[in-house]
């Protein structure tokens, strides 16, 4: 059964609470990064950002050590303060389309991850796993939680609401069009209740953060072989944010292709027509309205694509995914894209207004064809994870998108 653990978080002081946390580093443009750092020189970004001239000449190990030094400096300056007692942290945020997310920040068990009680739906890249493991080994903290989800459970919901009412410390702030609220749950009774109710869950599912969880597991295995490194046992868990599956918002993750692999538009349509039904939908952005329907934009027109033969009931869960159908029948068979992860002809556009963005890119002549997919449902994600299979790259774009530095897990 699932194990979660309280921990002594390192958190921004009340004075720095509003401006300390940050979005994913990669989500900032160079200009946004520059402006954010100028406006908030003591933000989490200031810890992980290295000036280009430094980044160019330092070895990875030296860059990671510099991150650790800057982190320790902010603790010394009391920008960051470590809690004195272990706690769970109930975190509530309002993000995309005024959608409210509420869950619990806790340490998730590396043992559960290794035993597949924490289930995966995405393949990881060994090089990225090892790079982040080395980073964690040097800095000894994790500031970006893995997003985990669990089946809706009224008992857990009641326990969380009770813990919120009992909390002695609550903080609220807003930044970048988002609102945030956190409750520090450090009384023993509520900690025991939350530990117990989550302990009755048979499986947790990774919604976002496959590389982070894999890297934490790699590091834990390495530390296990080094007795001198085993101080506290915090390394046996990793920073996670757990929310009920009904709260997840899964958006479409769409594809845009540079060229037609040497085919004319007519030849391309003829080849698609062998396996798929094609319906012209006009010149305005058309979004897939159901599973097994794919939207396509080509040469000024939108089309609806659907399989000529229904998916057989004995097909695997992975073969029934629209991302896999597109990969099998179009990207690989017609366009010659055998590896979506590495082929430079394919790019990805996610979320709202993505078909409009695809239309613009193709009309500008930058790309040849684009495909829109109906968002994958949580039951599909769980079915893939339960089967031990993995989805094609960029199959899901999931909210909430979690900020780094709200609670920092030190080990």
Which functions belong to the PLM regions below?
Residues 1-411:
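Surface-exposed, charge/polar-rich loops and edge strands
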